[in-house]
Amino acid sequence: MPTQNFQSARKCRRVRHHISRRFNQRLICIAIATLGESASWAGGEQVLEKVEITGTATNLVGVADSANVGTVTKKQLEARTVYRPGELLESAPGLVVSQHSGEGKANQFYLRGFNLDHGTDLRTTVDGMLVNQRSHSHGQGWTDLNFLIPELATGLEYKKGPYYANEGDFASAGAVSIRYADRLDSGIANLGFGQNGFRRALIADSPKLGNGNLLYAVEAMHNDGPFVHGDDYRKSNGVLRYSEGDQANGFNVSAMGYTAKWNATDQIAKRAVDAGTLGRFDAIDPSDGGESHRYSLSGAWHRSTETSSTNVNAYVTDWKLRLFSNFTYFLDDPINGDQFHQPDDRTTTGVNASHTWQMQGLGLASENTVGAQFQNDNIFNGLYSTRDRQILSKTRSDHIAETGLGVYAENATRWLPWFRTVAGVRGDTYRFHVGSNLDANSGKVTQSIANPKLDLIFGPWAKTEFYLNAGGGFHSNDARGTTLTVDPKTGDPADKVPALVRSKGLEVGVRTSFVPGLQTSLSIYRLDFASELVFAGDAGTTEAGRPSRRTGFEFANYYKLSDWLTVDADLAFARARFRDNDPDGIGLRIPGSVEGVGSIALAVDNLGRWFGALQFRYFGPRPLIEDNSVRSASTATFNGRVGYKISPRTRVDLEGFNLTNRKASAIDYYYTSRLPGEPAAGVNDIHFHPIESRSFRVTLSTNF
């Protein structure tokens, strides 16, 4: 390899300080380490422009595989005003994070025409640990991000569509990765107070210890929300990490712990609010709520040479959830009510490993990656009928052992100065072992799936690239559905479902930084699912969904107008339909599928001691039933913050949420429920959870 490329390899490591080594590492190294820094032929070799890193954004022209991948920097995350930790994910264009219950419950997610429920089809990892929970008692892919400490995040990386060989289960709509810091620039101490019982304290630092750093963070928080029966959400959170080395060579070992308890105001019937018998923030069953904990031990090791890199991480997590909900009130049990309990106790172990090496020959530069991902879940969960959190009867209880192994290979090659490809293949095998309280619903199932991936990248010309992406993906179904033969509630025969459901995606896109200071990407996509089979945790049975298709576009812009003003503006639209010609005549719309999402965010800094931000988010109307005769309203909110730097190390922030105090819904459903005195068959109605009323929080922060 020429000396020039060895020097560029060192630059590659410096870039990785800003871009996670797990994100598009193959093309970063092709672009910088293997090919150099000019967009021309040199000595018979093809070379690319270097990756441009700024303090606020990463320019991925010449590096990214598609128009829908991106990196959100730490500075961008810090500028966001978030009501809850999970809302950090809204920095990915087109992604909406909501809540339909108490604060301790996993968020509701929307992306690319999907109502992702609590995380299905949006793969989320923190420090390489999969957050989505398989075969969860409440919902497949349950993604509880309440353990996240925003101040520790070094950045967020997102990808959309099933085009990436290193992304497996749950990644059909997209994948989000968050990485914690190994070392802080300085210690952090925050103290916050606000309306509705909000209180938060955080202290974190990373002093030197031996040859490395020992990072610690401790967080405590309380919040009631605007509800008549307050959430009384109490959270304790901690992180301890020892690390040595840098982004090129090093390791870390981490321990995390999170506990929480809360009350929940679940969605309420619109008819009761319209009649004046119930307020928007009232609860129908005030005993709803839950408690949860998450403990984890993890480690990561990485090593790089001039022409290769190896990454390994391993983790073990212990999750526990006690969740009490009541969505239909008195429909099934007019005496005791319909509250149900969904316990979930699990231990998850996982290992991820990948190796990348560069090659040159025949005037071509390429990079190869092979990897393996293993995860095992040992799960005890169930479904019980309750009243005031006291068990009345058992619907089902199960012990589940679920093991998944994925292997993948990928090649990235530049064929011409203006054309490169990324081709990959991924294979996954899952084994389910279900031991149910009903022997008829016990059993073992093994299923495998393979998916090809292909990216064609053209350019760059005038700092502009064009993309064509195609690939297959999948999500796993709840293990209990794969062995189900009897409805545990009624005793009727029930059909089993496939363990793995295939998806197919196709996308065209463009990315440009031609206008100085402006980064723009546009993508048009199609995503098909063979079936949206899901396990209905609220009923203990499977629901066989129909084949579906989603088409849409996403338009994302980041514009640094000056040293003191930046603008993020995103627009997304999706058309979601069942594609089975409607044999039952009920309609082709997919209930809950988001159609339009828009956002614009202004961030102001470097104005003396003042700084601030303003965010607008639009969440469009959605069909609530298949024939589109019942639809939700749209939701539009303004959040903002203004801050003052008391000294170089101390500042005060005032954050405001729902500044216009709109009375809108965080989520809407349409189904049958029964309030006291109503007909035994119940009433079909919209059920909604309101967005929080206008509120403010003040936080004093200091660095030490």
Residue ranges, per PLM feature:
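Short strand-turn segments of transmembrane beta-barrel domains in outer membranes
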Residues: 157-165, 174-207, 218, 223-228, ...
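Short acidic/polar hinge/loop motifs at secondary-structure boundaries
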Residues: 130-160, 178-179, 497
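Extracytoplasmic beta-strand/coil segments of soluble accessory domains associated
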Residues: 86, 90-133
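Gram-negative outer-membrane beta-barrel transporters
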Residues: 354-358, 521-529, 544-626, 699-703
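Face-selective signature of the C-terminal outer-membrane beta-barrel domain
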Residues: 250-258, 290-437, 457-461, 514, ...
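C-terminal beta-signal and adjacent terminal beta-strands/loops
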Residues: 77, 567, 621-622, 644-704
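Membrane-embedded beta-barrel scaffold of Gram-negative outer-membrane proteins
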Residues: 300, 309-327, 459-475, 497-563, ...
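Transmembrane beta-barrel wall of Gram-negative outer-membrane proteins
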Residues: 193-222, 227-265, 288-309, 415
